[in-house]
Amino acid sequence: MWVILALLAIVAAACGGDDEGGGETGGETGAATGAGEGITVGVSWNNYNEERWAKFDEPSIVAALDAAGAEYISSDAGSSAEQQLTDVENLISQGADVLIILPQDGEAILPAVQSALEQGIPVIAYDRLIEDPGALYITFDNVEVGRLQAEAVFAQVPEGNYVFIKGNAADANADFLRGGQQEVLQEALDSGAIVNVGESYTDNWDPAIAQTNMEQFLTENDNDVQAVVASNDGMAGGVVAALEAQGLAGSVAVSGQDGDLAALNRVALGTQTVSVWK
């Protein structure tokens, strides 16, 4: 929730919402002062079908903006970087005063971001980095998420063969998460207590691609895998499906993040080790 509150504060500041009454409100947020009155906030989601965005983040953003008196408009790129370019231009055409963008590809989105900035429209990159210094950036501590994932898996499997299922190569978070995981596991890797027997990026964080990659790693290693550090719950689902096909589900530690309902069910069943909620 602190990320949503910080996001609202940035929106209010970007639109000059703190120009009046700042000395009287103390610690109150824009929601309490009506700082968003008359502001239209356009949100470009990379993929609204992701449970985390649809069930938690969007409702929180909508509620905060509504309380501040701001209008919310949105678009869903369906995991298409090309579609997101069009979406952002459409949000501008609809009168967005501020843009919040969860980018599918932090570099591919640059033409639309630069167009917005040239028109004086503030741009906030949400969760994922946009490679433009003019775009504000608010995110979670993804390195710490990676650490927590690795700690949970390593606590269960301190020795053995590890596979790393990373996120989309075009998303900086994939490397932030992997960096945190590496911090925790470096000593064990150096000592040979654990061995990295497979590592891959996953286009669009797609569970089906994660499953295919995991199937390949199982084949390459004759199913001799004891742990999988998967960077989110969707991909963890693909990993578990690959493990189930080989009769290994429940015997291999698997990480994730986002607190998806399906992932929590897998944790309860013992086929997934951890889901980090950020």
Describe the function of each predicted region.
Residues 1-3:
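Bacterial N-terminal signal peptides that target proteins for export
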Residues 15-278:
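A residue-level marker of the well-folded mature domains of exported/periplasmic proteins
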Residues 10-14:
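C-terminal motif of bacterial Sec signal peptides marking the signal peptidase cleavage site
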